[in-house]
Amino acid sequence: MTVVANTGPLAARRKLGTELRVLRDRHGWTAEEVGAHLGCHISKVSRLELGKRACTKRDFESLMNLYDVDSDRRAELRELMLRSIQRTPPWWHAYNDVISANYAEFLTYEAEASHCREHQPLLIPGLVQTEAYARAVTTYGIDAVGPQQVDTLVEVRMRRQERLRESPPLQMDLVITEASLRVKVGGPATMKGQLCHLLSLREVENVSLRVIPFDAGEKGTSTGAFTLFATGVGPGVDAAFIESAETRTIFRDDPVAVRRLDRLFNHLTSAALPQEASATLIEHIAKEMEHSA
């Protein structure tokens, strides 16, 4: 096992949990037996192995002794454990006065993900919004906020976009609908600027943008917007966030729900135009916006 130097607390916790499960299975221990050894309920063992709970130093050493882990492997796993309990505040901690708990959890996954898949049926995804578009959406969105809060939330959204330029950058697969391109958010001029920005993404290798045209019919319909994150710790997607008018985002990490949304994203992708054809459609709509400005 190699510990990635820039592994964040969330990814480290999930990776350590996976390793603990492998060790338990290898030694033939049940979760109940491990819980008895630690002096805790089986639910704690389950949460440790799922990466939903940080492993304390005391529990870590107890588990390493139980599984008879050699010194080299123990040192690697200890590094993961220490990373998983790091308390360095993330950059968005400075915006806690306007960021909800759901949004903070979303930002945590976004910050540590290696791959993101997002579907938006009516709006442009946040990581590829222009500042003018983001301001219009935030000002007239479902949340009633004042001018100062709008400024702060837009600042957060612009800062989030640094993930696309980091090393290594976040890999993004975006699927939007033609409606997302035609709704004149902020007016024709703002929308045209947004469309031009989307066209510039053709030069960004880690961003894939595809559009579901109106003539895709029912194949391009879904119940709403959602985002899938993969941290690269294990195979597939780790978590999903579903947008809701009432709670803003609903977090799901149970495998069944995540796999269902991953399949839905694949279906939506199959209904979308290829990237070049999507760019052609965006160019066409941008010209229409120019004439109506």
Annotate each language-model stretch with its function.
Residues 2-18, 26, 32-36, 50, ...:
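Interdomain hinge/linker segments and adjacent boundary elements that couple functional modules
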Residues 168, 175, 185-293:
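C-terminal regulatory/effector modules of DNA-binding transcriptional regulators
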Residues 29, 40-41:
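The short coil/loop that forms the "turn" connecting the two helices of the helix-turn-helix
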